[in-house]
């Protein structure tokens, strides 16, 4: 299933497969998060990329930029994600989500109440939970892949 979704089988899944319960649980969680009814696939992939850029995980940066491209995110957006605040490629709602993703992807976490106040201007409570879920999922993957050297 993951191969058909991503176009390849990630090394992280190969290592997780050594613990079938972990692999099954992770796959269910990732499927739920990527199947959000409140966020479009472009935004999910941009949040994943921003969070991975912020954490410094090169493996996840490569895979999330590939995922964004496969989801149809414009090459211009992918190229300008580090300059999203000044770029006219991103909507105000995308900028609010990316503000949180870049801040929450840091260690220690740099998210603030102001991030959530701005998100409230653009998203429902359910969508905000889904934004945080994407960031948290990639927090796990960033640590997993950097630790195992995927």
Predicted regions and their residues:
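Hydrophobic alpha-helical segments
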Residues: 1-150
């Amino acid at each position: 299933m993951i191969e058909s979704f991503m176009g390849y089988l990630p090394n992280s899944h190969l290592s997780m497969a050594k613990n079938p319960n972990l692999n099954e649980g992770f796959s269910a969680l990732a499927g739920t998060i990527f199947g959000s009814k409140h966020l479009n696939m472009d935004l999910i992939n941009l949040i994943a990329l921003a969070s991975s850029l912020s954490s410094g995980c090169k493996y996840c940066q490569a895979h999330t930029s590939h995922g964004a491209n496969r989801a149809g995110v414009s090459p211009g957006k992918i190229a300008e994600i580090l300059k999203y605040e000044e770029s006219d490629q991103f909507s105000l709602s995308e900028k609010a989500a990316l503000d949180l993703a870049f801040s929450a992807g840091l260690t220690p976490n740099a998210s603030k109440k102001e991030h959530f106040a701005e998100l409230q201007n653009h998203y429902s409570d359910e969508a905000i939970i889904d934004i945080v879920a994407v960031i948290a999922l990639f927090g796990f993957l960033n640590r997993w892949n950097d630790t195992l050297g995927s």
